[in-house]
Swiss-Prot record:
Keyword tRNA processing on entry: no
Protein name: Phosphopentomutase
Gene that this polypeptide is encoded by: deoB
Cross-referenced PANTHER family: PHOSPHOPENTOMUTASE
A Gene Ontology cellular-component term: cytosol
Membrane in keyword set: no
Annotated Pfam families: Metalloenzyme
Broadest EC class assigned to this enzyme: isomerase
Binding site for Mn(2+) 1: D10, D347, H348
InterPro entries: Alkaline_phosphatase_core_sf, DeoB, Metalloenzyme, Phosphopentomutase_DeoB_cap_sf
Residues holding Mn(2+) 2: D306, H311, H359
Amino acid sequence: MKRAFIMVLDSFGIGATEDAERFGDVGADTLGHIAEACAKGEADNGRKGPLNLPNLTRLGLAKAHEGSTGFIPAGMDGNAEVIGAYAWAHEMSSGKDTPSGHWEIAGVPVLFEWGYFSDHENSFPQELLDKLVERANLPGYLGNCHSSGTVILDQLGEEHMKTGKPIFYTSADSVFQIACHEETFGLDKLYKLCEIAREELTNGGYNIGRVIARPFIGDKAGNFQRTGNRHDLAVEPPAPTVLQKLVDEKHGQVVSVGKIADIYANCGITKKVKATGLDALFDATIKEMKEAGDNTIVFTNFVDFDSSWGHRRDVAGYAAGLELFDRRLPELMSLLRDDDILILTADHGCDPTWTGTDHTREHIPVLVYGPKVKPGSLGHRETFADIGQTLAKYFGTSDMEYGKAMF
């Protein structure tokens, strides 16, 4: 029986890549800088002391970081027994965004350039804005700028509630984001607006990767909160992923937990499970692992590392999240059968000590564990697509165009 379980710790980079200078990210190191802050006692907010990740360390995390950067993260045990196979992987894709990272993991790197809204003020073309106002019958719009999602709610949330004007904003990523209040504007209305925006961006040739619905609740600035009803409308991958091949060639099953289905525009996904927060995502993953049959992938994205702590530059929060993940990791490992493989990885970096609020161009960890997986180093991987090619070989699908099987 062949089953694979892929866990993406969204944004969990392990050191800047060789081409980081092109992105302004030389020296970025999500894991290393979190560990350094913890070791210095600078991340003692609800948790305390050095970063404590014994289970991830046993799977090779500290060694993968050493391969990427040349050193073991502060406070982590470089001499611990390693029971898994580990690697550090470079991104072939042209960006450092979520779709590029995930698609490349599944064997389809993004070799074209995404479109971006690079102006920090008046970010969107007037023609696009006019079409959205007309088609969605809007009273106008707010924002039209680059912003952090939480900052813009404090700035414009109250005005949005009074006027009914949606908040449009973007970032350094290829995204068009729309924030609206779940109660005063309505969730269904927000989703419909996002569908219209997706159509206009596609038809207009803007080449924008994602439209993201950002619903929130609350009654005034300072207590607005984004909810778990986020929805991403992505373009489809430019070629069949290993997920699609498993479904088409092996009549397999691919279970999305969290936002995976959105990232792949539902391509190659046979079941979608919604969950919000690390514990709920873990619980849903465990349930699906227990029910998984032959030729099945259970694919989970743990988005909180990125959205709650990476972008918000919350070192202590990120550290606490990693420690929670590590504590629960044995629950996943205990469910593995003889031929199963568990892959822990990431899609990009988002160093919470870095300037700004955007992603960072970093190597990702590739930690592989299973009863039949030989422990030890798998070395430096030239592309995330090595994961996809490994899965193609494991399940016996046709080869992917990119990547080399790791074993």
